[in-house]
A protein has these predicted regions:
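C-terminal motif of bacterial Sec signal peptides marking the signal peptidase cleavage site
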Residues: 16-19
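Short, hydrophobic/aromatic-rich segments at coil-to-beta transitions
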Residues: 35-41, 67-75, 133-142
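Positively charged n-region of N-terminal signal peptides that target proteins for export
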Residues: 1-9
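Long, charged/polar, surface-exposed segments that mediate recognition or autoinhibition
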Residues: 93-123, 186
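Secretory pathway targeting signatures of secreted, lumenal, and periplasmic proteins
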Residues: 48-103
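Bacterial signal peptide processing site
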Residues: 21-23
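Surface-exposed amphipathic alpha-helical segments
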Residues: 57, 166-193
């Protein structure tokens, strides 16, 4: 009886950990909204969005363990790794993606507005531009960092149905990177279910 109970706990824990390592416990759909088959090479964001690897970056982590599986994130990195403090490392360039599942489209839109309201802090906005890719509108916010390990970056905040998405690319000046083009290419690699 004890062995069965321990085995059940280990099995449950391994399933949870496996789910977290593959983008959460929400499985990807078989097809996208347009009927295109799901590609297993995409990073699964909450079973609603498949994301291609940004060119020149390597996947570092993907998780769906925050806030009862409503928040998922992924990080891709490029360049030299630097230790900031014990157990904290940064790279010359990092791409972050965070998604949050909301109860409704109205709630998601309110969350988008909240994200815009929080934008700033140690960042200096240098440009703001709206682009449309595959029928999806994105607002790109370019910035310089004043108190960060990075020197500059670009952020996109948008909504897809009841999901909020925040993408950010930040880099040190040592990395020659066209942030705007990198972000546009990254956003073009999103596939919606």
């Amino acid at each position: 009886m004890k062995k069965t109970g321990i085995f059940a706990v280990i099995l449950a824990l391994s399933l949870v950990l496996t789910g977290c390592m593959t983008g959460g416990m929400i499985p990807p759909p078989e097809t996208l909204a347009d009927g295109t088959p799901w590609n297993t090479e995409w990073v699964n964001m909450a079973g609603k969005v498949g994301v291609e690897r940004p060119e020149g970056f390597d996947l570092l982590t993907t998780n769906g363990t925050l806030e009862d599986m409503t928040i998922h994130y992924a990080t891709w990195v490029r360049g030299e790794e630097t230790e900031v403090d014990k157990d904290t490392y940064i790279y010359e360039g990092q791409v972050y993606l965070m998604t949050e599942l909301c109860d409704s489209e109205a709630s998601a839109q309110a969350t988008v507005e909240q994200w815009y309201g929080q934008f700033g802090g140690n960042l200096t906005l240098t440009d703001r531009e709206t682009v449309t890719l595959a029928g999806q509108e994105f607002e790109l916010l370019s910035y310089d960092c004043t108190d960060s390990h990075f020197d500059r970056g670009i952020t996109a905040i948008w909504r897809y149905g009841s999901m909020v998405l925040v993408a950010d690319i930040a880099c040190a000046d040592t990395l020659e990177l066209d942030l705007r083009q990198t972000m546009v290419d990254f956003l073009a690699g999103f596939h919606y279910a």
